Amino acid sequence: DEDGKEKNVYSWRLDKNDPMPKGKKREPSLREKEKQIEADLFDHIVTNGGNYTVLELVEKYVSLKTGVRHNTVAGYKPVINMLKKESFGNLRIDKVRLSDAKAWLIKLQQIDGRGYSSIHSIRGVLRPAFQMAVDDDLLRKNPFEFELASVIVNDSVTREAITRKQQRDLLKFIQEDKHFSRYYDAIYILFHTGLRISEFCGLTVSEIEFGEMRIKVDHQLQRTAQMQYVIEEPKTDKGIRYVPMTEAVAACFRRIITNRKTPKVEPMVEGYAGFLFLDKNDMPMVALHWEKYMEHIIQKYNRIYRIQMPKVTPHVCRHTFCSNMAKSGMNPKTLQYIMGHADISVTLNTYTHVNFDDAKEEVYRIANS
């Protein structure tokens, strides 16, 4: 090999035209193996993929990912645990072909019943791990370098914005409900600012600037699986921003601050204190709290009314705000700034929901102007 060590290679056949002995599994001939070894040595490709298995390669890749966000690290663990149970994880990396990678992902969806988004996350770890192997001269090509949607069915449900009428009906229901009215101000703010839920949870009293009628957004609050509270930078570089407030939004914030419970000990997370909402343990509320509250609100609404309300989450509130602003004619670059998107294509394509009625209204507006 390239280290000068002598190694042996075996095959049941000398030449590719020789017959395979009866009962033996077909494999490359000795001459074919010799050519492959010579080519690998010439190109400085490490023979046998360095003897790494798929699992070992992914573990090495993850071990080198220092300085990433805690939720990114949390996403690696399920992939490693799954590979420990899968025979695919024990394959030597140089034995994995493009067709093997595709067949495995198809198996995950069609046999194991995994969803598209789950498989997308799995491939999101394996592709860069195998690319690391290519960069390290362990492999010639990356077997996971292909368009995922061309291999498995995208069965993920698109998170749609709700209509203006649905938004009005939902907010009216929350405001008038004896139990859920306590959450009205917060949900109104989510619908009318487009804040990410972790940004909203991270807000402190000092960041609501009533004089300037703006909200300072420079961090987000998250809670790990180990129940540890952490402060993270916003999701993108453009996430640090000031979000303007309307009078109605400002009124909601004033009521929230006025009604804010006074804890025995003010919780502090990495230097931040004065969080707007605290739970029963006097700790800051996180995204999971609001997701559950909204889930219960929708369940009660749909038990009462015949016309059902679709699933509404804090992120749907963000979609809805963006969609409403776009339909109202807001400049796309202004909307990108308010949303904190790094790429304007996300603003235009992912969050903006336009249907036929919107198109019809716009055509009539231009025709009559």
What residue spans do the PLM features occupy?
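N-terminal core-binding DNA-recognition domain of tyrosine site-specific recombinases/integrases
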Residues: K22-R26, G50, V62-R140, S156, ...
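DNA/chromatin major-groove-contacting recognition/catalytic segments
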Residues: L170, Q226-I231, S328, N349, ...
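Basic, Lys/Arg- and aromatic-enriched nucleic-acid-binding interface segment
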Residues: H120-I122, L139-K141, E145-L203, F210-G211, ...
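Catalytic-site neighborhood detector that most strongly recognizes the C-terminal catalytic loop/helix
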Residues: V153, A161, Q220-L221, M339-Y364
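N-terminal DNA-binding module of tyrosine recombinases/phage integrases
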Residues: E2-K102, T258-Y272
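Conserved tyrosine-mediated DNA breakage-rejoining catalytic core shared by Y-recombinases
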Residues: A149, L203-K261, P267-M268
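Short, basic (Lys/Arg/His-rich) helix/loop patches that form interaction surfaces
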Residues: K172-Y183, T193, V243, N259-M268, ...
